[in-house]
């Protein structure tokens, strides 16, 4: 019996916050792995997605959005994004076609050039008419003629098949790093924490989501094949804790119920979720939390 030839290729997706990196990762692997919210800077660490197509295994790295960082946490997130380039065969810069090229995007382009990285450009959100797209295409064609450009829509899937064909064509003969059915190498504890953090981002207003983190403290498999999960929501102020709890605990119950449903849908088994809120001032300056967040 002839042994199947195996190929692998790794892809790093970088770009500004809310340009569609996480949506594209989820679109390609066919699962909602990387959390997506309307708020910027939702992704804090490198999220690894895996898809195996015939003989080729594609490893995708979704990265934190690159912006001008201010605090310690923001600086760590941006460093994390740039560090992902070293692990990739292909670097893809995703650009929001609904916005003009701004100074941050130009800074990203300049840094890639200084690193001798020739990116593949992904002009995202083409499912919506844009007055900026022609100017962006013209600028990239004139200044980055060595780079390929794919106009895509991560949310609708338009042209993502062509992008996958290109990625697959760049794969090299090498043993797969993961099992054929794997979609990520992230621990389930981490994924569960990200699911809860997504619900906090969606359910809380203004700046509060940026002032918290979530840790899965306990993961206990029960005899009935369900799992008991204890999570701690860490905030920097007592007033934030009050908001998350809500009147008579109503808000945290609502957020917990939504998180539990998402976990059950993703993991495929019943979940008993218990959320607790802890106040720790300046937790953003504690490197122990960064290690847990993988940044």
Curated annotation (Swiss-Prot):
Residues 7-176 form the Era-type G domain. GO terms for molecular function: GTP binding; GTPase activity; ribosomal small subunit binding; small ribosomal subunit rRNA binding. One of its GO terms (biological process) is ribosomal small subunit assembly. The keyword Membrane applies. It is a peripheral membrane protein. Its main location: cytoplasm. Keywords: Cell inner membrane, Cell membrane, Cytoplasm, GTP-binding, Membrane, Nucleotide-binding, Ribosome biogenesis, RNA-binding, rRNA-binding. Residues 15-22 are annotated as: G1. The keyword tRNA processing does not apply. CDD domains: Era, KH-II_Era. InterPro entries: G_ERA_dom (IPR030388), GTP-bd (IPR006073), GTPase_Era-like (IPR005662), KH_dom-like_a/b (IPR015946), KH_dom_type_2 (IPR004044), KH_sf_prok-type (IPR009019), P-loop_NTPase (IPR027417), Small_GTP-bd (IPR005225). Signal peptide: none annotated. It is found in: Cytoplasm; Cell inner membrane. Residues 124-127 are annotated as: G4. GTP binds at residues 15-22, 62-66, 124-127. Residues 62-65 are annotated as: G3. Residues 204-281 form the KH type-2 domain. One of its GO terms (cellular component) is cytosol. Pfam families: KH_2 (PF07650), MMR_HSR1 (PF01926). Belongs to the TRAFAC class TrmE-Era-EngA-EngB-Septin-like GTPase superfamily. Era GTPase family. An essential GTPase that binds both GDP and GTP, with rapid nucleotide exchange. Plays a role in 16S rRNA processing and 30S ribosomal subunit biogenesis and possibly also in cell cycle regulation and energy metabolism. Monomer. This is GTPase Era.
